[in-house]
Amino acid sequence: MALQLLTPSFSFQHSPSPHKLTTLRYTHHRIRCTASAPSYSDLVRRRSANYKPSKWDSNFVETLESDYKKENHEMYIEKLMGDVKHLMKEVVNPIEKMELVDTIQRLGLGYLFNKEIKEVLNTITTSKATLKTKKDLHAVALQFRLLRQHGYEVSPDAFHEFKDEKGGFKESLCMDIKGMLCLYEASHLSFQGEVVLDEAREFTSTHLKAIGGNIDPVLLKKVRHSLEMPLHWRMLRLEARWYIETYDEEDRKNPSLAELAKHDFNSVQTIYQRSLKRMSRWWRDLGLGERLEFSRDRLVECFFWTTGVIFDPQFERCRGVLTKVNQLVSTIDDVYDVYGSLEELELFTDAVDRWDIRAMEQLPEYMKICYLALYNTTNDIAYEALKEEGLDVIPYLKKVWTDLCKSYIVEARWYSNGYKPTLEEYLENAWTSIAGPVALVHAYFSFGQKMPFEALNYSNTSSLIKWSSMIFRLCDDLATSSDEVARGDVPKSIQCYMYEAGVSESVARDHIKYLIDEAWKKMNECLVYNTPFLQPLINAGLNLARMAHCMYERGDGHGFSNELDKKRVLLLLAEPFKFM
């Protein structure tokens, strides 16, 4: 199946028009989930996913507190900020300017210097000085990556300069390890049809894997890190943590940059800790985890997901909304995948579609609790958007939840009937059932800005949501499909392709990895032709795909987390940098 056959179908064109304030009634129907104990029917045969308890309990969250106090370092941080701004003006050489921008971004400081970075990139695109770098592989690749990453129109044709008369990349390039590494990273920002970048990735990955240990140890460390997963696919806040430590090992490091990066990381970490405590109290008060014992209680994991998608400290409200959404998705997913009978699930889907408090009367007790949690939480989120930005977003939030539940019920019917969908049929439903659209639409209305409704129907927005969710789905399937099918679930993309093409699991997995590569190319196209107000959503879409790689890199990091997942949570949320 060719991935390009799947065209974006995400649209709000048929959504009801936003209501006037005077017609809002949903805030008057808030009902607590603790009204009565659930009554589980013994007549329905229930499945079990055998999920283990979360590695993180409420005690971990409540005792989470950093010794770092930003207010004790305010004057020093201001000085460091000034030093970096001065440095960005002082550096004249175009290559050194690009390297400085790249370093600032990789240290996690890009959000502090957006204006200065934009000025540098604008200068690069208009300056003839960069023409002198066209024979420098490192410079050409770095310029391409930075410009494309920031949405500039840039052609990969410059890389043809590094080919020989036979059309292949020159073997002499293998001596330039720094340039090869930069070209490898740049190749991951390709669009469909950019063959030279496909060739560049194959050429550089082959030769970088073959290098010995006879090179600068810091450069070797970067090569191995990149081959493990390219920068463009990495969870950026964890990458910043890794790069801060690596930058400390460099002989030519800038002390002000190194110090500022550590202070910023610690400062943002304290914001995360405060937010997580607030989310923990929300989840405890909601009572859903205790009432529905069959479902995954994964508040910390959901918050970790959220910080990967929305990591900028100024979007604290958005992180709160997205954490709630992620935990509700996790719970409702377990209702559909694990516990509910098909008849019950049909009723629940209908109730969500109606979005009426009276719809819960038809539900079994355990579903009433789940429905109320969804109804109340979503309406609270909508009320906040109405209060802060004057936007009535309930029709849009209701639509993505309805679409999600309808995609869940399709899979439940497939499972009940023993139906095996084609890969294309599966993916047309599965990019919605992975809940990417739910997450991104809620994020869109929670950035603290008055976001225009019509932007959700832009073709670029539809593509962003579609391909980000597709990467999320395919990464999830690579990591979890065997366990999910074993416990009784619809065939996933791997199994669908095995049945359809008559191939082994190994071949099917390679095909899914190919589809992930192709989906990234479609995602990369969303970086160009965007408008400024869509930039937070574009970043969130990219980061959602990156978090999929992070969480499913070595198994199911959400349902069955391992020691690597635990280490990552601690690095991001619990362990500050120490100062001498």
UniProtKB/Swiss-Prot annotation:
Positions contributing to Mg(2+) 1 binding: 333, 337
Molecular-function GO terms, alphabetical: alpha-thujene synthase activity; magnesium ion binding; terpene synthase activity
UniProt-listed Enzyme Commission number(s): 4.2.3.-
Catalytic reactions on record: (2E)-geranyl diphosphate = alpha-thujene + diphosphate
UniProt: (2E)-geranyl diphosphate binding residues: 296, 333, 337, 473, 476
UniProt xrefs under Gene3D superfamilies: Farnesyl Diphosphate Synthase, Terpene synthase, N-terminal domain
EC class: lyase
Residues holding Mg(2+) 2: 333, 337
Tissue specificity comment: Expressed in developing and mature fruits. Barely detectable in leaves and shoots.
GO BP annotation list: diterpenoid biosynthetic process; green leaf volatile biosynthetic process; monoterpene biosynthetic process
Record flagged with keyword Magnesium: yes
Pfam families: Terpene_synth (PF01397), Terpene_synth_C (PF03936)
Binding site for Mg(2+) 3: 476, 480, 484
Principal location: plastid
Pathway(s) per entry: Secondary metabolite biosynthesis; terpenoid biosynthesis
Cited InterPro entries: Isoprenoid_synthase_dom_sf, Terpene_cyclase-like_1_C, Terpene_cyclase_plant_C1, Terpene_synth_N, Terpene_synth_N_sf, Terpene_synthase-like, Terpene_synthase_metal-bd, Terpenoid_cyclase/PrenylTrfase
Motif DDXXD motif mapped to chain: 333-337
Entry note: cofactor: Binds 3 Mg(2+) or Mn(2+) ions per subunit.
GO cellular component entries: chloroplast
Swiss-Prot/TrEMBL cofactor(s): Mg(2+); Mn(2+)
Interval spanned by the transit peptide: 1-32
Location(s) in or outside the cell: Plastid, Chloroplast
Comment, domains: The Asp-Asp-Xaa-Xaa-Asp/Glu (DDXXD/E) motif is important for the catalytic activity, presumably through binding to Mg(2+).
Known function: Monoterpene synthase (TPS) involved in the biosynthesis of monoterpene natural products used by traditional Chinese medicine to treat headache, inflammation and intoxication. Catalyzes the conversion of (2E)-geranyl diphosphate (GPP) into alpha-thujene.
Family: Belongs to the terpene synthase family. Tpsb subfamily.
The protein's name in its UniProt record: Alpha-thujene synthase, chloroplastic
